[in-house]
Amino acid sequence: MLDLYDAEVRIDNQSNSDVYQRHLGVLADAADVKVSREINGDYTLDFKYPSGTELFERIAVNCIVKCEGQLFRIMRISYESAQMAQISCLHVFNCDAKRFHVPNIGSTDTSDTIGVSPYSVINSAFEGTPFTVLSYEKVQQLGMKWVGATDGFLIDFESVDKTTPYDVMMQVIENCGRGEIYVNNTEIALVERLGT
């Protein structure tokens, strides 16, 4: 089942529940629903929807679609015919983490960026965004381990500015040479391996 929400969605991470501005309806007529996820890559939702329905008039780029408990942002609406539209969505992490700009990570004091944990770099990058970086304990409760949690693995991370949290996450993965992105709506972590 797919639910449609307006473009502004707030997540209440404290109570671990979704708080929506406005539910626009259930997309009961959705067809050919396909969710795809690449490790450390795009997490997408694609579906077809008849254009002659009342709810179709409310579907717009940037609206949120909830599928399988995950939130996806509509990125593109194209038409296969006059009666059928193809809707393409990106997970809110893949989309929204690229919209925020990190003013600066680190400083001229290299103790902020040399020999630091992947967690501390990622936590700094996502500070002030709607995303919550999960703690070591929370990730362990999910049956996974943060990169560097058990072996004390540290990285050197060059001070960067004018970047996005998403780009920082990708750079940390490259610097570590390992890790997989765990994402549950706006909760994120860099784990050794997804699953248990």
Each predicted region: which residue ranges?
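Catalytic micro-motifs at enzyme active sites that drive phosphoryl/nucleotidyl and oxygen chemistry
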Residues: 34, 74-78, 157
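Extracellular structured ligand-interaction cores
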Residues: 44, 69-71, 178
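Charged- and aromatic-enriched interaction segments used to assemble
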Residues: 84, 92-196
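Residues at beta-strand starts and edge strands
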Residues: 41-45, 83-85, 186
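Short, solvent-exposed secondary-structure boundary motifs
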Residues: 17-28, 62-68, 166-174
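Short beta-strand and beta-hairpin "edge-sheet" elements
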Residues: 63-90, 94, 182-184
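Juxtamembrane "anchor/assembly" segments of surface/extracellular structural proteins
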Residues: 1-58, 90-96, 106-116
